[in-house]
Amino acid sequence: MSIKSDKWIRRMAENEGMIDPFEPGQVRYNADEQRLISYGTSSYGYDVRCADEFKIFTNVHSAIVDPKNFSDDSFVDVKSDVCIIPPNSFALARTVEYFRIPRSVLTVCLGKSTYARCGIIVNVTPLEPEWEGHVTLEFSNTTPLPAKIYANEGVAQMLFFESDEVCETSYGDRGGKYQGQRGVTLPRT
């Protein structure tokens, strides 16, 4: 299994629709020449953007977090260019980009160091072979202060690994519960 390069990522995005919308280079400034947290193609990965749809966790109902019986009541929906995450809390968001993962590829997501150095951790599970959809992102604010996430800027990097052998059963074959997800998707059992 080997990690894939910028050339491969560009080819797969442009010819196979693996990433949509796709940025072939690294974007570091907006149209007004203001600095951004970078996104787009890097040497051995793709830096994704966070869309402007957020679900911010709140415990106004004194609920218990149960992945088998998760309630949307635990979140406040926000549509904004920024998301303020309360201290020691978290928020869900989604990528701007829609992914279509090839059958021979496993994709792993890592948080960007810009956020990690501020105590904001990005968590995403692997994107399995033949999975497609918007990626649901989880941002944990590990600090005792409110933390800010910027929409339409880089938040995490996707690394693509291609196997020497194609899997026998893909996520698509199994009819995975998150197949084709759009928007911020809560846990399903």
Curated annotation (Swiss-Prot):
The keyword Hydrolase applies. Pathway: Pyrimidine metabolism; dUMP biosynthesis; dUMP from dCTP (dUTP route): step 1/2. The keyword Transcription does not apply. DCTP binds at K112, S113, T114, Y115, A116, R117, T136, L137, E138, Q157, Y171, Q181. It catalyses: dCTP + H2O + H(+) = dUTP + NH4(+). Keywords: Hydrolase, Nucleotide metabolism, Nucleotide-binding. Its EC number is 3.5.4.13. The active site is at E138 (proton donor/acceptor). It comes from the Bacteria. GO terms for molecular function: dCTP deaminase activity; nucleotide binding. Pfam families: DCD. It is an enzyme of class 3 (hydrolase). Catalyzes the deamination of dCTP to dUTP. Homotrimer. Belongs to the dCTP deaminase family. This is dCTP deaminase.
